[in-house]
Protein backbone atom coordinates (compact mmCIF):
# COMPACT_ATOMS: atom_id res chain seq x y z
CA UNK A 1 0.00 0.00 0.00
CA UNK A 2 1.29 3.45 -0.91
CA UNK A 3 2.07 5.49 2.17
CA UNK A 4 -0.15 8.55 2.44
CA UNK A 5 1.26 12.04 2.72
CA UNK A 6 1.10 13.48 6.22
CA UNK A 7 0.39 16.91 7.66
CA UNK A 8 0.23 17.94 11.31
CA UNK A 9 -1.98 20.37 13.17
CA UNK A 10 -0.55 21.71 16.42
CA UNK A 11 -2.96 23.42 18.79
CA UNK A 12 -1.09 26.29 20.43
CA UNK A 13 -3.57 29.13 20.85
CA UNK A 14 -4.10 28.91 24.60
CA UNK A 15 -3.17 31.69 26.99
CA UNK A 16 -1.98 29.58 29.90
CA UNK A 17 -3.59 31.61 32.68
CA UNK A 18 -2.27 29.31 35.39
CA UNK A 19 1.32 30.01 34.33
CA UNK A 20 0.87 33.59 35.61
CA UNK A 21 3.08 34.81 32.80
CA UNK A 22 3.14 37.24 29.88
CA UNK A 23 4.40 34.40 27.68
CA UNK A 24 1.87 32.19 25.88
CA UNK A 25 1.78 28.80 27.59
CA UNK A 26 3.43 26.84 24.79
CA UNK A 27 6.50 29.12 24.78
CA UNK A 28 7.50 28.04 28.28
CA UNK A 29 10.55 25.85 27.98
CA UNK A 30 11.62 22.38 28.92
CA UNK A 31 15.18 21.20 28.27
CA UNK A 32 16.06 24.61 26.89
CA UNK A 33 13.43 25.03 24.19
CA UNK A 34 9.75 25.98 24.08
CA UNK A 35 7.26 23.18 24.60
CA UNK A 36 5.75 23.78 21.17
CA UNK A 37 9.20 23.56 19.56
CA UNK A 38 9.51 20.00 20.86
CA UNK A 39 6.21 19.17 19.16
CA UNK A 40 7.23 20.89 15.91
CA UNK A 41 10.49 18.94 15.87
CA UNK A 42 8.65 15.66 16.43
CA UNK A 43 6.27 16.48 13.57
CA UNK A 44 9.26 17.08 11.29
CA UNK A 45 10.84 13.78 12.40
CA UNK A 46 7.55 12.08 11.61
CA UNK A 47 7.78 13.33 8.04
CA UNK A 48 4.96 15.89 8.09
CA UNK A 49 4.99 17.79 4.80
CA UNK A 50 2.98 20.65 6.30
CA UNK A 51 2.73 21.77 9.91
CA UNK A 52 -0.28 23.98 10.63
CA UNK A 53 0.38 25.89 13.86
CA UNK A 54 -2.83 27.22 15.41
CA UNK A 55 -2.00 30.30 17.45
CA UNK A 56 -3.97 33.01 19.24
CA UNK A 57 -2.93 34.54 22.55
CA UNK A 58 0.41 36.34 22.38
CA UNK A 59 0.56 36.04 18.61
CA UNK A 60 3.41 38.52 18.19
CA UNK A 61 5.48 36.70 20.81
CA UNK A 62 4.73 33.38 19.15
CA UNK A 63 5.83 34.57 15.75
CA UNK A 64 9.00 36.23 17.07
CA UNK A 65 10.08 33.24 19.19
CA UNK A 66 9.38 30.77 16.37
CA UNK A 67 10.34 32.97 13.43
CA UNK A 68 12.69 30.37 11.95
CA UNK A 69 10.23 27.48 12.08
CA UNK A 70 8.86 26.05 8.84
CA UNK A 71 5.18 26.15 9.76
CA UNK A 72 1.92 27.43 8.34
CA UNK A 73 0.70 30.08 10.77
CA UNK A 74 -3.06 29.80 11.32
CA UNK A 75 -4.68 32.42 13.54
CA UNK A 76 -7.55 31.44 15.83
CA UNK A 77 -8.98 34.81 16.80
CA UNK A 78 -11.50 33.34 19.24
CA UNK A 79 -10.77 30.24 21.29
CA UNK A 80 -14.02 28.29 20.85
CA UNK A 81 -12.81 24.76 21.49
CA UNK A 82 -10.52 22.14 20.02
CA UNK A 83 -12.66 21.35 16.98
CA UNK A 84 -12.93 25.05 16.20
CA UNK A 85 -9.12 25.28 16.41
CA UNK A 86 -8.56 22.42 13.97
CA UNK A 87 -11.26 23.80 11.68
CA UNK A 88 -9.20 26.97 11.17
CA UNK A 89 -6.61 24.88 9.33
CA UNK A 90 -9.08 22.64 7.46
CA UNK A 91 -8.97 24.74 4.24
CA UNK A 92 -5.33 23.70 3.90
CA UNK A 93 -6.04 19.96 4.19
CA UNK A 94 -5.68 17.72 1.15
CA UNK A 95 -8.42 15.12 0.92
CA UNK A 96 -6.12 12.13 0.54
CA UNK A 97 -3.48 13.01 3.14
CA UNK A 98 -3.38 11.93 6.76
CA UNK A 99 -3.76 14.66 9.37
CA UNK A 100 -2.39 14.19 12.89
CA UNK A 101 -3.63 16.50 15.64
CA UNK A 102 -1.05 17.39 18.29
CA UNK A 103 -0.89 19.75 21.27
CA UNK A 104 1.71 22.44 21.84
CA UNK A 105 1.61 22.01 25.61
CA UNK A 106 2.25 18.23 25.48
CA UNK A 107 5.89 18.25 24.41
CA UNK A 108 7.00 14.69 25.15
CA UNK A 109 5.03 12.83 22.49
CA UNK A 110 7.42 10.62 20.53
CA UNK A 111 7.82 9.85 16.86
CA UNK A 112 7.56 6.11 17.59
CA UNK A 113 4.18 6.41 19.30
CA UNK A 114 2.79 8.57 16.50
CA UNK A 115 4.05 6.12 13.88
CA UNK A 116 2.06 3.34 15.60
CA UNK A 117 -0.99 5.59 15.67
CA UNK A 118 -0.76 6.42 11.96
CA UNK A 119 -0.19 2.79 11.05
CA UNK A 120 -3.32 1.79 12.97
CA UNK A 121 -5.61 4.33 11.27
CA UNK A 122 -8.41 2.58 9.37
CA UNK A 123 -9.39 3.67 5.88
CA UNK A 124 -11.74 6.70 6.16
CA UNK A 125 -11.72 6.29 9.94
CA UNK A 126 -9.98 7.65 13.01
CA UNK A 127 -7.08 6.42 15.12
CA UNK A 128 -7.22 7.84 18.62
CA UNK A 129 -4.34 7.89 21.11
CA UNK A 130 -5.43 6.82 24.57
CA UNK A 131 -3.72 6.05 27.85
CA UNK A 132 -4.54 4.01 30.96
CA UNK A 133 -4.50 6.00 34.20
CA UNK A 134 -4.64 4.65 37.74
CA UNK A 135 -6.69 7.72 38.62
CA UNK A 136 -8.70 8.78 35.56
CA UNK A 137 -10.76 11.38 37.42
CA UNK A 138 -11.54 14.36 35.23
CA UNK A 139 -10.74 12.67 31.92
CA UNK A 140 -13.03 11.50 29.14
CA UNK A 141 -13.49 7.70 29.32
CA UNK A 142 -13.06 5.54 26.23
CA UNK A 143 -16.14 3.41 25.49
CA UNK A 144 -15.44 0.38 23.31
CA UNK A 145 -17.55 -2.20 21.52
CA UNK A 146 -15.81 -5.17 19.92
CA UNK A 147 -12.51 -3.36 20.35
CA UNK A 148 -13.58 -0.25 18.47
CA UNK A 149 -14.17 3.13 20.10
CA UNK A 150 -17.83 4.11 19.97
CA UNK A 151 -17.83 7.08 22.33
CA UNK A 152 -15.88 9.27 24.71
CA UNK A 153 -17.87 9.98 27.86
CA UNK A 154 -16.86 12.93 30.00
CA UNK A 155 -16.54 12.53 33.77
CA UNK A 156 -19.72 14.45 34.57
CA UNK A 157 -21.78 12.35 32.15
CA UNK A 158 -20.39 8.93 33.07
CA UNK A 159 -22.40 6.28 34.90
CA UNK A 160 -20.97 4.13 37.68
CA UNK A 161 -19.64 1.45 35.33
CA UNK A 162 -18.09 4.00 33.00
CA UNK A 163 -16.38 5.76 35.91
CA UNK A 164 -14.44 2.54 36.55
CA UNK A 165 -12.88 2.66 33.09
CA UNK A 166 -9.17 3.49 33.26
CA UNK A 167 -8.63 4.17 29.55
CA UNK A 168 -8.92 7.89 28.76
CA UNK A 169 -8.67 10.20 25.80
CA UNK A 170 -5.46 12.16 25.13
CA UNK A 171 -6.86 14.29 22.29
CA UNK A 172 -4.22 13.12 19.82
CA UNK A 173 -5.82 11.63 16.71
CA UNK A 174 -5.26 10.83 13.04
CA UNK A 175 -7.68 10.82 10.14
CA UNK A 176 -7.62 11.78 6.48
CA UNK A 177 -8.17 15.32 5.28
CA UNK A 178 -11.51 14.65 3.59
CA UNK A 179 -12.98 13.00 6.69
CA UNK A 180 -11.74 15.77 8.97
CA UNK A 181 -13.35 18.44 6.80
CA UNK A 182 -16.64 16.51 6.60
CA UNK A 183 -16.92 15.89 10.34
CA UNK A 184 -15.61 19.26 11.50
CA UNK A 185 -18.36 20.96 9.49
CA UNK A 186 -20.96 18.95 11.46
CA UNK A 187 -19.61 19.59 14.98
CA UNK A 188 -22.01 21.67 17.06
CA UNK A 189 -21.61 23.68 20.24
CA UNK A 190 -24.70 22.52 22.10
CA UNK A 191 -22.94 22.10 25.44
CA UNK A 192 -22.55 24.00 28.69
CA UNK A 193 -19.44 25.80 27.50
CA UNK A 194 -20.80 26.64 24.06
CA UNK A 195 -17.62 25.29 22.46
CA UNK A 196 -16.82 22.96 19.57
CA UNK A 197 -15.12 19.78 20.76
CA UNK A 198 -12.87 17.50 18.75
CA UNK A 199 -14.16 14.53 20.75
CA UNK A 200 -17.49 14.89 18.93
CA UNK A 201 -15.79 13.47 15.84
CA UNK A 202 -15.91 10.02 17.43
CA UNK A 203 -19.71 9.98 17.47
CA UNK A 204 -19.89 11.48 13.98
CA UNK A 205 -17.55 8.82 12.60
CA UNK A 206 -19.67 6.08 14.16
CA UNK A 207 -22.81 7.63 12.69
CA UNK A 208 -21.16 7.31 9.27
CA UNK A 209 -20.20 3.69 10.02
CA UNK A 210 -16.52 4.63 9.96
CA UNK A 211 -14.23 2.70 12.25
CA UNK A 212 -12.57 4.37 15.23
CA UNK A 213 -9.63 2.52 16.76
CA UNK A 214 -7.54 3.35 19.80
CA UNK A 215 -3.81 2.98 20.29
CA UNK A 216 -2.55 3.14 23.85
CA UNK A 217 0.50 5.18 24.76
CA UNK A 218 2.84 3.01 26.80
CA UNK A 219 4.25 5.92 28.78
CA UNK A 220 1.81 8.28 30.47
CA UNK A 221 4.34 11.12 30.46
CA UNK A 222 4.30 11.20 26.65
CA UNK A 223 0.83 12.70 26.72
CA UNK A 224 1.08 14.80 29.87
CA UNK A 225 0.54 18.50 29.35
CA UNK A 226 1.69 21.47 31.39
CA UNK A 227 -0.95 23.94 32.55
CA UNK A 228 1.06 25.39 35.42
CA UNK A 229 4.68 25.67 36.47
CA UNK A 230 4.49 22.68 38.81
CA UNK A 231 3.47 20.46 35.90
CA UNK A 232 6.12 22.12 33.73
CA UNK A 233 8.78 21.27 36.31
CA UNK A 234 7.59 17.65 36.39
CA UNK A 235 7.97 17.40 32.60
CA UNK A 236 11.42 18.96 32.85
CA UNK A 237 12.61 16.44 35.44
CA UNK A 238 11.17 13.53 33.52
CA UNK A 239 12.88 14.55 30.29
CA UNK A 240 16.18 15.32 32.00
CA UNK A 241 16.17 11.92 33.71
CA UNK A 242 15.40 10.26 30.37
CA UNK A 243 18.28 12.08 28.68
CA UNK A 244 20.68 11.32 31.53
CA UNK A 245 19.71 7.64 31.48
CA UNK A 246 20.45 7.45 27.77
CA UNK A 247 23.89 9.02 28.27
CA UNK A 248 24.69 6.67 31.15
CA UNK A 249 23.84 3.69 28.97
CA UNK A 250 26.14 5.13 26.29
CA UNK A 251 29.03 5.16 28.77
CA UNK A 252 29.00 8.74 30.07
CA UNK A 253 29.63 8.87 33.83
CA UNK A 254 27.07 11.30 35.21
CA UNK A 255 27.70 11.40 38.94
CA UNK A 256 24.11 12.30 39.83
CA UNK A 257 21.49 12.14 37.05
CA UNK A 258 19.07 14.15 39.21
CA UNK A 259 21.51 17.07 39.12
CA UNK A 260 22.30 17.19 35.41
CA UNK A 261 20.61 19.30 32.73
CA UNK A 262 20.93 18.80 28.98
CA UNK A 263 19.32 21.68 27.10
CA UNK A 264 20.47 20.83 23.60
CA UNK A 265 22.54 18.04 22.06
CA UNK A 266 25.61 16.30 23.43
CA UNK A 267 28.09 14.36 21.30
CA UNK A 268 30.65 12.53 23.40
CA UNK A 269 33.64 10.23 23.32
CA UNK A 270 34.61 7.47 25.74
CA UNK A 271 35.11 7.72 29.51
CA UNK A 272 33.59 11.17 29.87
CA UNK A 273 32.88 12.21 33.47
CA UNK A 274 30.32 14.86 34.42
CA UNK A 275 30.02 16.01 38.02
CA UNK A 276 26.89 17.42 39.68
CA UNK A 277 24.95 20.53 38.64
CA UNK A 278 26.45 20.72 35.15
CA UNK A 279 24.35 22.40 32.44
CA UNK A 280 24.86 21.55 28.77
CA UNK A 281 23.26 23.99 26.31
CA UNK A 282 23.10 24.19 22.53
CA UNK A 283 25.38 21.84 20.62
CA UNK A 284 28.26 20.46 22.68
CA UNK A 285 30.93 17.98 21.61
CA UNK A 286 33.16 16.29 24.19
CA UNK A 287 36.18 14.19 23.27
CA UNK A 288 37.49 11.11 25.04
CA UNK A 289 38.29 11.22 28.76
CA UNK A 290 36.91 14.72 29.28
CA UNK A 291 36.22 15.61 32.91
CA UNK A 292 33.73 18.33 33.78
CA UNK A 293 33.67 19.58 37.35
CA UNK A 294 30.69 20.54 39.45
CA UNK A 295 28.60 23.55 38.53
CA UNK A 296 29.98 24.12 35.02
CA UNK A 297 27.95 25.55 32.14
CA UNK A 298 28.89 24.56 28.56
CA UNK A 299 27.11 26.11 25.59
CA UNK A 300 27.97 25.44 21.95
CA UNK A 301 31.52 24.26 22.62
CA UNK A 302 33.92 21.69 21.20
CA UNK A 303 36.20 20.08 23.79
CA UNK A 304 39.18 17.93 22.79
CA UNK A 305 40.43 14.69 24.32
CA UNK A 306 41.77 14.58 27.89
CA UNK A 307 40.55 18.06 28.83
CA UNK A 308 39.70 18.83 32.43
CA UNK A 309 37.21 21.60 33.13
CA UNK A 310 37.32 22.35 36.83
CA UNK A 311 34.31 23.45 38.89
CA UNK A 312 32.18 26.51 38.20
CA UNK A 313 33.60 27.38 34.80
CA UNK A 314 31.41 28.84 32.04
CA UNK A 315 32.26 28.14 28.39
CA UNK A 316 30.28 29.51 25.44
CA UNK A 317 30.86 29.29 21.68
CA UNK A 318 34.44 28.19 22.27
CA UNK A 319 36.92 25.51 21.19
CA UNK A 320 39.34 23.81 23.60
CA UNK A 321 42.23 21.65 22.39
CA UNK A 322 43.31 18.33 23.86
CA UNK A 323 44.95 18.04 27.29
CA UNK A 324 43.96 21.59 28.24
CA UNK A 325 43.01 22.53 31.80
CA UNK A 326 40.27 25.07 32.47
CA UNK A 327 39.23 26.59 35.79
CA UNK A 328 38.07 26.60 38.43
CA UNK A 329 35.95 29.74 37.95
CA UNK A 330 37.08 30.40 34.36
CA UNK A 331 35.00 32.04 31.67
CA UNK A 332 35.42 31.42 27.96
CA UNK A 333 33.24 33.78 25.96
CA UNK A 334 32.28 33.50 22.27
CA UNK A 335 35.24 33.20 19.94
CA UNK A 336 37.71 31.79 22.47
CA UNK A 337 39.96 29.14 20.91
CA UNK A 338 42.47 27.34 23.11
CA UNK A 339 45.11 25.08 21.57
CA UNK A 340 46.35 21.82 23.08
CA UNK A 341 47.90 21.76 26.56
CA UNK A 342 46.81 25.28 27.47
CA UNK A 343 46.01 26.27 31.04
CA UNK A 344 43.34 28.82 31.92
CA UNK A 345 42.91 29.32 35.63
CA UNK A 346 40.67 30.93 38.20
CA UNK A 347 38.91 34.21 37.44
CA UNK A 348 40.27 34.40 33.89
CA UNK A 349 38.01 35.69 31.11
CA UNK A 350 38.87 35.09 27.46
CA UNK A 351 36.80 36.53 24.61
CA UNK A 352 37.28 36.37 20.83
CA UNK A 353 40.89 35.30 21.25
CA UNK A 354 43.25 32.44 20.42
CA UNK A 355 45.71 30.95 22.89
CA UNK A 356 48.56 28.86 21.47
CA UNK A 357 49.78 25.42 22.49
CA UNK A 358 51.20 25.13 25.99
CA UNK A 359 50.44 28.73 26.99
CA UNK A 360 49.20 29.54 30.47
CA UNK A 361 46.78 32.23 31.63
CA UNK A 362 46.39 31.20 35.21
CA UNK A 363 44.99 33.98 37.38
CA UNK A 364 42.72 37.03 37.41
CA UNK A 365 43.19 38.02 33.77
CA UNK A 366 41.14 39.47 30.91
CA UNK A 367 42.11 38.54 27.35
CA UNK A 368 39.94 40.06 24.63
CA UNK A 369 40.39 40.39 20.85
CA UNK A 370 43.84 38.88 21.13
CA UNK A 371 46.20 36.33 19.64
CA UNK A 372 48.56 34.62 22.07
CA UNK A 373 51.27 32.35 20.69
CA UNK A 374 52.60 29.08 22.06
CA UNK A 375 54.43 28.52 25.36
CA UNK A 376 53.56 31.95 26.75
CA UNK A 377 53.03 32.79 30.40
CA UNK A 378 50.45 35.47 31.13
CA UNK A 379 50.77 36.54 34.75
CA UNK A 380 48.12 37.38 37.32
CA UNK A 381 46.07 40.51 36.80
CA UNK A 382 47.03 41.08 33.15
CA UNK A 383 44.52 43.05 31.08
CA UNK A 384 44.35 43.47 27.33
CA UNK A 385 42.84 46.93 26.96
CA UNK A 386 40.91 46.34 23.75
CA UNK A 387 38.23 49.04 23.80
CA UNK A 388 38.58 52.80 23.49
CA UNK A 389 34.91 53.50 24.15
CA UNK A 390 33.96 53.24 20.49
CA UNK A 391 36.01 50.54 18.75
CA UNK A 392 37.75 47.25 19.57
CA UNK A 393 41.46 46.69 18.82
CA UNK A 394 43.69 43.61 18.75
CA UNK A 395 46.59 42.55 20.92
CA UNK A 396 49.01 40.14 19.22
CA UNK A 397 51.51 38.23 21.36
CA UNK A 398 54.11 35.94 19.78
CA UNK A 399 55.60 32.67 21.03
CA UNK A 400 57.58 32.21 24.27
CA UNK A 401 56.47 35.54 25.71
CA UNK A 402 56.45 36.21 29.45
CA UNK A 403 53.98 38.86 30.62
CA UNK A 404 54.45 39.82 34.26
CA UNK A 405 51.65 40.33 36.73
CA UNK A 406 49.51 43.47 36.68
CA UNK A 407 50.45 44.38 33.11
CA UNK A 408 48.15 46.34 30.83
CA UNK A 409 48.49 45.94 27.07
CA UNK A 410 46.81 48.90 25.39
CA UNK A 411 45.65 47.75 21.95
CA UNK A 412 46.43 47.88 19.13
CA UNK A 413 49.79 46.48 20.13
CA UNK A 414 52.15 43.64 19.15
CA UNK A 415 54.58 41.74 21.35
CA UNK A 416 57.19 39.77 19.40
CA UNK A 417 58.55 36.28 20.12
CA UNK A 418 60.62 35.81 23.25
CA UNK A 419 59.80 39.19 24.78
CA UNK A 420 59.61 39.69 28.54
CA UNK A 421 57.35 42.28 30.14
CA UNK A 422 58.03 43.18 33.75
CA UNK A 423 55.30 43.20 36.36
CA UNK A 424 53.26 46.38 36.65
CA UNK A 425 54.07 47.54 33.11
CA UNK A 426 51.73 49.43 30.81
CA UNK A 427 52.46 48.60 27.15
CA UNK A 428 51.38 51.23 24.62
CA UNK A 429 53.90 50.53 21.82
CA UNK A 430 55.01 47.38 20.03
CA UNK A 431 57.61 45.21 21.79
CA UNK A 432 60.47 43.72 19.76
CA UNK A 433 61.80 40.17 19.75
CA UNK A 434 63.57 39.07 22.96
CA UNK A 435 63.24 42.56 24.48
CA UNK A 436 62.68 43.24 28.18
CA UNK A 437 60.17 46.02 28.72
CA UNK A 438 59.38 47.63 32.05
CA UNK A 439 57.67 50.95 32.75
CA UNK A 440 57.58 51.04 36.53
CA UNK A 441 58.86 54.18 38.23
CA UNK A 442 61.96 53.75 40.35
CA UNK A 443 61.30 52.42 43.85
CA UNK A 444 62.03 55.02 46.55
CA UNK A 445 62.85 54.41 50.23
CA UNK A 446 62.00 57.32 52.56
CA UNK A 447 63.43 56.90 56.03
CA UNK A 448 61.51 58.06 59.10
CA UNK A 449 58.21 58.45 57.27
CA UNK A 450 55.39 59.61 59.57
CA UNK A 451 51.90 58.45 58.80
CA UNK A 452 49.16 61.09 58.87
CA UNK A 453 47.39 61.46 62.21
CA UNK A 454 43.61 61.57 62.38
CA UNK A 455 42.21 64.93 63.37
CA UNK A 456 39.98 64.87 66.45
UniProtKB/Swiss-Prot annotation:
One CC-aspect GO term: membrane
GO molecular function, one term: magnesium ion binding
Compartments it resides in: Cytoplasm
Binding site for acetyl-CoA: 380, 386-387, 405, 423, 440
Ligand binding (UDP-N-acetyl-alpha-D-glucosamine): 11-14, 25, 76, 81-82, 103-105, 140, 154, 169, 227, 333, 351, 366, 377
Residues annotated for Mg(2+) binding in this entry: 105, 227
Region (Pyrophosphorylase) residue spans: 1-229
Family of the protein in this entry: In the N-terminal section; belongs to the N-acetylglucosamine-1-phosphate uridyltransferase family. In the C-terminal section; belongs to the transferase hexapeptide repeat family.
Assembly notes: Homotrimer.
Name by which UniProt lists this protein: Bifunctional protein GlmU
Name of the gene encoding the protein in the UniProt record: glmU
Amino acid sequence: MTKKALSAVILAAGKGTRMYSDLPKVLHTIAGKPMVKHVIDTAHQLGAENIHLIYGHGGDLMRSHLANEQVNWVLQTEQLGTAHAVQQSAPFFKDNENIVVLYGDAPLITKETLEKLIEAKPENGIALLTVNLDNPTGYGRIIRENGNVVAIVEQKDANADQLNIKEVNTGVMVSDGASFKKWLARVGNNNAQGEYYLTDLIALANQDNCQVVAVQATDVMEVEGANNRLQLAALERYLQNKQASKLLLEGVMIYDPARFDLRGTLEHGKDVEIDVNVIIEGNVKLGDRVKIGAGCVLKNVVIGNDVEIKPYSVLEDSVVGEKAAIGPFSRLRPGAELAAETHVGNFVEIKKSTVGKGSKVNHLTYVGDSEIGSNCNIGAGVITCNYDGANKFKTIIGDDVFVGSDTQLVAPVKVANGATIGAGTTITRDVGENELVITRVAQRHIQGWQRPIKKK
